[in-house]
């Protein structure tokens, strides 16, 4: 029997980054890494472009669950469908940053707090430490890779057992060690890492959206052919009109 879907709320103001994350998570459906081989839970992705919209969505779903009758099996199923298992948010966003969203979610005071994972294209140790201290489950560098999806799956409240909670401290310690190692890196090394991340992100966009890109190229090519055909037709009409004028003068 397949595992239950992991409901992920993706928060990013960049439409390209949102699309990349959606494609990556959906491509990982049914992959390995679950409790048993071939039984990894698929991802159900909901994407918004701001922290404000994320809080509105979480508040609305929380309010809907509060109005349901707990004793009703149908109500329990509906509440389960509305739940969000994990929030994956970008750090740099206008108005409400990923750090602000993290604090706002933690301030909801839910008995079962939603795990929050922060992502960023900038490898800044102070930023990583700040988010982990505020309660982030993990901090992932963009662009996301397949092993990052595995980390996201382990952080989600829907798939990790209670016995795995004890391992959170070890995970956070490992992330903190990575942050310390990044702090020890020279500015040139950090710039090289950022350039590599940007190039990898571009490659991921091209690979994940190959169908969309090829479709756009075909459309552009057809438009160019159409424009060329119209140009040739106009030239022929122009020459024909000039020829008709000369013929009329010669006949006169």
Swiss-Prot record:
| Induction entry | By cytokinin in roots and shoots.
Which Pfam families does the record match to this protein? Response_reg (PF00072)
Q: Where is this protein found?
A: Cytoplasm, Cytosol; Nucleus
Acetylation as a keyword of this entry, yes or no, is: no
Biological process terms from the Gene Ontology for this record are:
cytokinin-activated signaling pathway; phosphorelay signal transduction system
Q: How is it modified after translation?
A: Two-component system major event consists of a His-to-Asp phosphorelay between a sensor histidine kinase (HK) and a response regulator (RR). In plants, the His-to-Asp phosphorelay involves an additional intermediate named Histidine-containing phosphotransfer protein (HPt). This multistep phosphorelay consists of a His-Asp-His-Asp sequential transfer of a phosphate group between first a His and an Asp of the HK protein, followed by the transfer to a conserved His of the HPt protein and finally the transfer to an Asp in the receiver domain of the RR protein.
Does the keyword section mention Transcription?
Answer: yes
4-aspartylphosphate carried by residues: 90
Question: For the Response regulatory domain, which residue ranges apply?
Answer: 7-157
Q: Which InterPro entries match?
A: ARR-like, CheY-like_superfamily, Sig_transdc_resp-reg_receiver
Q: Mainly localized where?
A: cytoplasm
State the signal peptide span: none
Sorted alphabetically, the keyword list is: Cytokinin signaling pathway, Cytoplasm, Nucleus, Phosphoprotein, Transcription, Transcription regulation, Two-component regulatory system
Entry's Gene Ontology cellular component terms: cytosol; nucleus
- What function does this protein fulfil? Functions as a response regulator involved in His-to-Asp phosphorelay signal transduction system. Phosphorylation of the Asp residue in the receiver domain activates the ability of the protein to promote the transcription of target genes. Type-A response regulators seem to act as negative regulators of the cytokinin signaling.
Give the UniProt family note: Belongs to the ARR family. Type-A subfamily.
Task: Indicate what this protein is called per its UniProt record.
Answer: Two-component response regulator ORR2
Source organism: Oryza sativa subsp. japonica
Primary gene name: RR2
């Amino acid at each position: 029997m397949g595992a239950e879907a992991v409901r992920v709320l993706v928060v990013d103001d960049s439409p390209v980054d949102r699309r990349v994350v959606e494609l990556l998570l959906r491509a990982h459906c049914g992959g390995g890494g679950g409790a048993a081989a071939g039984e990894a839970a698929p991802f159900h992705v909901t994407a918004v472009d701001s922290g404000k919209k994320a809080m509105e969505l979480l508040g609305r779903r929380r309010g809907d669950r509060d109005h349901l009758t707990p004793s009703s099996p149908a109500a329990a199923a509906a509440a389960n469908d509305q739940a969000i298992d994990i929030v994956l948010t970008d750090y740099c966003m206008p108005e409400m940053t990923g750090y602000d969203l993290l604090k706002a979610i933690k301030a909801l005071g839910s008995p079962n707090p939603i795990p929050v994972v922060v992502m960023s294209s900038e490898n800044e140790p102070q930023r990583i430490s700040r988010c982990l201290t505020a309660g982030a489950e993990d901090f992932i560098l963009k662009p996301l890779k397949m092993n990052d999806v595995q980390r996201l799956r382990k952080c989600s409240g829907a798939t990790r057992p209670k016995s795995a909670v004890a391992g959170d401290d070890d995970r956070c310690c490992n992330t903190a060690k990575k942050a310390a190692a990044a702090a020890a890196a020279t500015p040139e090394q950090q710039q090289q890492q950022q350039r590599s991340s940007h190039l990898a992100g571009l490659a991921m966009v091209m690979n994940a959206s190959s169908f969309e890109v090829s479709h756009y190229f075909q459309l552009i090519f057809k438009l160019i052919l159409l424009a060329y055909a119209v140009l040739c037709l106009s030239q022929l009409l122009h020459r024909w009109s000039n020829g008709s004028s000369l013929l009329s003068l010669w006949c006169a």
